[in-house]
């Protein structure tokens, strides 16, 4: 039996201030749908919350299914660089909500940018 799942890529950027979901085709060239925390909550402080991430993921999953995509590979990204390396609270809630909405989850990978001894961090600027 052949696997006839149509795949897309869900790029999830989760910081401690906001969560942004962008779904593209497999090449990454064409954006199918995108959403951020500010589209589903009123308060700025709630943009990064797991609740906002769940609401966003449900809206995104509906639009993705309408576009004919059955499954997504998830790429989670935190702030990175010389900022915090781990993603915010919305990352895990987003993945769980996408799966619950009926999308098949393929691979989950962390694509947070890691510096290879770049610039000095803001916390250790004072010698």
Curated annotation (Swiss-Prot):
Pfam families: Ribosomal_S11. One of its GO terms (cellular component) is ribonucleoprotein complex. GO terms for molecular function: rRNA binding; structural constituent of ribosome. GO terms for biological process: translation. PROSITE patterns: RIBOSOMAL_S11. Keywords: Ribonucleoprotein, Ribosomal protein, RNA-binding, rRNA-binding. SUPFAM superfamilies: Translational machinery components. InterPro entries: Ribosomal_uS11, Ribosomal_uS11_archaeal, Ribosomal_uS11_CS, Ribosomal_uS11_sf. It comes from the Archaea. Gene3D superfamilies: Ribosomal protein S11. Located on the platform of the 30S subunit. Part of the 30S ribosomal subunit. Belongs to the universal ribosomal protein uS11 family. This is Small ribosomal subunit protein uS11. It comes from Natronomonas pharaonis (strain ATCC 35678 / DSM 2160 / CIP 103997 / JCM 8858 / NBRC 14720 / NCIMB 2260 / Gabara) (Halobacterium pharaonis).
